Amino acid sequence: VLEQIHRWQRKMYKEHGIHFIHASDEWYILAGLELPEEERYDGYLQLENGVGMLRLLDTEVRLAVEKRTGDEKPRSITVATGKLAAPYIEKCLEKISTKYPNLEYEVITIRNNFFGEKITVSGLITGTDLKEQLSNRKLGERVLIPCNMLRSGENVFLDDLTVDDVSKAIGREIVIVEEDGEDLVSSVLDPVQNKKQTRRQMYEQTSSSNSGQA
């Protein structure tokens, strides 16, 4: 399927100067293929459909890191996310650590026991699963979670647990990461009170499909 899409992309770009047809990030993840280069996303016109979210995140992290001078301050963080996004978050943290060599980090893949293990998106992870899988485990100084784990505009998970409930259970401050790469970098490096706050409902859209968006 992806090869057919790529053939049509080449044809459309040659004839009309736009690739027009795209596969969501999930297709590339499930196929074990690299995401397309940034130019093939035509300016990210279909982010709301899960097309290019992870490539854009990678680009935003790279640019955000380039703007910073770097330091050797010790930092220790844990990121909790879904199975699909975990490898890409790991790559983003590797980029950050190139300028911040004393950054210690771990990406923990949260298994979805609440809705079923076939659900691998972060947007359907509940507070209960976070609490059960992070408790009694060595964690960083703070735990980062993507904002799409929470109900829109609230600090409440789908199972009605609050961020404070989970934070108290695991004994760590929880930092909510908004859906852009700059905020991920800020969440990793900056004091929480100085963290840049943004809101963009694009990265890792909540999905009820068996595998879902990244």
Model region roles, listed by residue range:
Residues V1-A214:
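Auxiliary Fe-S-binding modules of radical SAM enzymes
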